[in-house]
């Protein structure tokens, strides 16, 4: 019998203290070993509640932010999810534990391929990846029940929000003057309501597919 990783236990306690109350979200994070998504040189910090650098000048998000964003989506196992910014694949792997299927777009080829290898090793078969311009979403697969952005949009990401199904929820960091705010969007017919959740710090959402890397 494999004993629980004490680092994961400590992280779970930290997440609960930070406001993560959804047991399913907590379970998804517990079943997604973060050290598999962190560069080896940062392996000793994999279970610290902090963002860490990854390749291509990007980051793997702080576990608390991953958990709170996932919780804000109110996922169930029927949801079709769009993720903008695959990065290390950590957020997509957590989503895949809770949703029917995850479609994830990444502008960096290196990151997308590394994430795909991790998904395969973890036998996560309900994640579909694409290398491309995340600012355009994934219109060929729209509409989506849920949408999540893991990079901060300079303004409300209307092109992406157009791909949200009626009754759907999106969560995205958005630039506001000298700060970034995590915003939850909810579609009701042709109307989209906004709720500010918290201040955050993310890498910027960049237009286009990266020519190198």
Swiss-Prot record:
Keyword Transferase appears in the UniProt entry: yes
UniProt-annotated catalytic positions: 61
Pfam families: PCMT
MF term (GO), any: protein-L-isoaspartate (D-aspartate) O-methyltransferase activity
Metal-binding as UniProt keyword: no
Function: Catalyzes the methyl esterification of L-isoaspartyl residues in peptides and proteins that result from spontaneous decomposition of normal L-aspartyl and L-asparaginyl residues. It plays a role in the repair and/or degradation of damaged proteins.
Protein's recorded name: Protein-L-isoaspartate O-methyltransferase
Species this protein is from: Maricaulis maris (strain MCS10) (Caulobacter maris)
Gene: pcm
